[in-house]
Amino acid sequence: MRFAAIADVHGNYLALEAVLADIRAQGVADIVNLGDMLSGPLDARRTIEILMQLDAVHVLGNHDRYLLDRPPEKMGSWDRPAHAALNAAQLDWLRAQPMTRVFREQVFMCHATPDNDEVYWLDTVHPDGAVALSPLDRIEQFAQGIAQSLILCAHTHLARAVRLRDGRMIVNPGSVGGPGFRDKHPFPHVVEAGTPHARYAILELTDGAWQVTFRHVVYDHEAMAALARRNGQPELANALAMGWIR
């Protein structure tokens, strides 16, 4: 089994197009998408048009859920413009996607953790704002009851692979479209990828073991940075331009 995992596109259609081209160039046919597809000050409509035509397996992220279960006046600055850009058929397509699913019997997919789409799985935010790899005991608690040998998550925008003591693997492929962001929960913190590249992962099962290849893809990030800046999001513009929000 060999497939690509993408996540956290956040309306960055140019990054998505570049990643899909790279996936094809690597000879990979199957794709799974771990959610947070559209929200952001970029181009939700172009992004969902690409995703709806893509032969892929999808799950929803927390921002996808916000687009479906919150009234526009209660949406945040990333969700409101995305919602306004989508038509009824596109929202219906989004609504049809599950929160979790199993891919080909061996891969468990979720956006954040199996039971909560807003909690970091592989990383912990400390009171001083530092973001670091979580203790293995905490990581394994979230994985209880999952039978699949490979577990995929996203949400943090940080590419990671963690092997559990029982041999299962948890992989976060990183973010296709958002190399940095600021959040307030559980403590104020920033996440910064350090480069503006679009990120995804290729997973391959070989002789009973999962091999992970993280890919960093060059694309016209300056165009997306300019769009974010025009739409009043200077920190995201910095992240898209450089991989740093500060």
Question: What are the roles of these predicted feature ranges?
Answer:
Residues 6-7, 31-35, 40, 57-62, ...:
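Active-site neighborhood of phospho(di)ester-bond hydrolases with catalytic His/Asp-centered motifs
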Residues 23-28, 103, 144-147, 202, ...:
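Glycine-rich phosphate-binding loop signature in dinucleotide/nucleotide-binding domains
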Residues 133-164, 168-173, 183:
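Anionic-ligand binding region
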Residues 10-15, 39-42, 64-69, 102, ...:
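Active-site environment of divalent metal-dependent phosphoester hydrolases
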Residues 47-109, 115-147:
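Active-site neighborhood of divalent metal-dependent phosphoester bond hydrolases
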Residues 1-4, 102-108, 165-168, 209-210:
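Beta-strand-turn-beta hairpins that frame and shape the catalytic cleft
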Residues 163-246:
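Acidic, His/Gly-rich catalytic cores of divalent-metal-dependent hydrolytic chemistry
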Residues 1-56:
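N-terminal active-site segment of His-dependent metallophosphoesterases
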